[in-house]
Amino acid sequence: GKAFEKAAGVLLEKHLSLEDPEPDPRFYPPWIVRLERYVLACRLEETLSLPGASMDDLRCLAEAFSDQGITATQGMQPSTNSLITRLMEDWVCHPGDRQRMEQVAEALALIRTIGAPYPAWHLQDLFISVRDGPALKWETGARAGAEEAVAWWGSFQALGRALGVCVPGGAGHPQP
């Protein structure tokens, strides 16, 4: 439980503090590698499920996973990933906010890089609600050449591709 996770984290921090300032994870003893994987997976699960988790928290964890060469977290359920769901729902409430949309795309990329599960169908459904509603206005603006609309539409199409959702005007769906 939580007590074991905390103890594992303390043990890992203690061991790493005794190592060289720039330790090479390839030379860690196997038990440290397993402990580190466990601690990072616990921190990831906690971060993804906390209501107050931020993109900075996710970026730090993604960096730690990358530094240690760890991917493919096992045992997590997609429903525990409330961070990406919260970001997506926030963007859906403010669909014209390109910064929020790009934050969703960044979070999705980081989560995929780490190998954490996420509720793909739910995210796709939320995306489709924007595609079939508010996005139509932005598409019209993009076709007219409005600079902000063109930028928004490009980000929107990229997010659609990342989610595996067809977007009119995207690849395979030529604009009329």
PLM feature spans:
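Extended alpha-helical scaffold segments
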Residues: 1-176
